[in-house]
Design a protein with these regions (language model features):
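Non-catalytic alpha-helical scaffolds and adjoining flexible linkers that form interface surfaces
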Residues: 1-238
Length: 238
């Protein structure tokens, strides 16, 4: 059966001498793995449209096993601005990897697709220090892990909140402090990201507070996934 959908390429890997398996997150079917036949040939009909990060309109044939077959792919956005910047490529790769690890085949999640699309667009528009950390926090919140930020996660005290602990699930007061010490600026940025002021947070210039938020976001994502994010190492080197 043929079907149409809209997807973003998360990753690809070789199959045989000329084909590739393409892993998409799609708007209508969630995570999909499909074979692109002949895509590695010089004169492939797909050209470069099925590279990681590509936003494409797809026609696929639904396979009987685990793999569908890509029959058509038309580019919607190739995110050229990101591809021309090594730092942006590294940041985008960490977003793709997080979604790839988070998404499950057969689980339809239009919000996950839209969140990744929005994250890539934000990264293309401006490469601020909080684009990827904000994406991680929003993705974790979508999956049900939303840190407690308005009061101590242990005793409920409203403050001052001076630490963040992953096992506690959020911020902690001075009496219950453990985990990572956080400044008032970090607390403010976390609240902005998850409290409806994302635009303002994304415009923040680089500072020690944005670096701390980035480290916390990476640790929280890896804690949730129970694995290291390989692309974060690349990001550290970019």
């Amino acid at each position: 059966m043929l079907y149409r959908d809209e997807g973003i390429v998360l990753r690809t890997y070789k199959l045989g001498e000329a084909d590739r398996i393409i892993v998409f997150v799609t708007r209508g079917r969630g995570k999909v793995r499909a074979v692109a036949k002949g895509v590695r040939k010089t004169k492939s009909k797909f050209g470069s449209r099925l590279e990681p990060m590509s936003h494409v309109a797809l026609q696929l044939f639904e396979g009987r096993g685990e793999l569908d077959i890509v029959t058509q792919a038309e580019s919607i956005d190739h995110f050229r601005v990101i591809r021309d910047d090594l730092d942006r490529i590294a940041r985008a790769s960490s977003m793709l990897e997080a979604v790839d690890q988070m998404a499950q085949e057969g689980e339809v999640s239009p919000r996950l697709f839209q969140m990744l699309l929005g994250g890539l667009r934000a990264l293309a528009d401006h490469n601020g220090p909080l684009v990827v950390p904000a994406f991680f926090w929003k993705l974790l919140a979508l999956e049900g892990y939303r840190p407690i930020l308005d009061a101590c996660a242990e005793c409920g005290s409203e403050g001052p909140l001076v630490a963040f602990d992953l096992d506690a699930g959020g911020l902690l007061c001075a009496d219950d402090r453990r985990g990572t010490a956080v400044s008032p600026e970090v607390v403010d940025l976390l609240r902005r990201i998850l409290g409806g002021q994302l635009g303002a947070a994304l415009n923040e210039p680089a500072s020690s507070a944005t670096t701390d938020v980035e480290h916390l976001a990476t640790r929280a994502m890896e804690h949730h996934l129970e694995r290291r994010l390989k692309s974060v190492t690349l990001l550290d080197r970019a």
